[in-house]
From Swiss-Prot:
GO terms for cellular component: contractile muscle fiber; costamere; cytoplasm; M band; muscle tendon junction; nucleus. Residues 19-63 are annotated as: Disordered. Keywords: Phosphoprotein. The keyword Magnesium does not apply. Signal peptide: none annotated. The modification Phosphoserine is found at residue 36. It comes from the Eukaryota. The lineage of its organism: Eukaryota, Metazoa, Chordata, Craniata, Vertebrata. InterPro entries: Chisel (IPR029268). Plays a role in the regulatory network through which muscle cells coordinate their structural and functional states during growth, adaptation, and repair. This is Small muscular protein. Pfam families: Chisel (PF15355). Belongs to the SMPX family. Abundantly expressed in heart and skeletal muscle. Expression is increased by passive stretch. The gene is Smpx. It comes from Mus musculus (Mouse).
Length: 85
């Protein structure tokens, strides 16, 4: 039986929490965006056609649906038990 130093075991156990691909190039944190934004007119709100798409967002088939409209309609619905029909 060969005896291995205990320090090797501790070193291996300490590296368990390193995520996969952490040492690959470009795996660091993305660069921070600048805080300054170009001045826009406050009186003209942006419409849905003028909004820029979010980077990395997938384009799904079909019309764009506003989530708040669905939530408003859903809040107006009520449960009707089978006996009251």
């Amino acid at each position: 039986m060969s005896k291995q130093p205990i320090s090797n075991v501790r070193a291996i156990q300490a590296n368990i929490n390193i995520p996969m691909g952490a040492f690959r190039p470009g795996a660091g944190q993305p660069p921070r965006r600048k805080e300054s934004t170009p001045e826009t007119e406050e009186g003209a709100p942006t419409t849905s056609e003028e909004k820029k798409p979010i980077p990395g967002m997938k384009k799904f088939p079909g019309p764009v649906v506003n989530l708040s409209e669905i939530q408003n309609v859903k809040s107006e619905l009520k449960f009707v038990p089978k006996g009251e029909q």
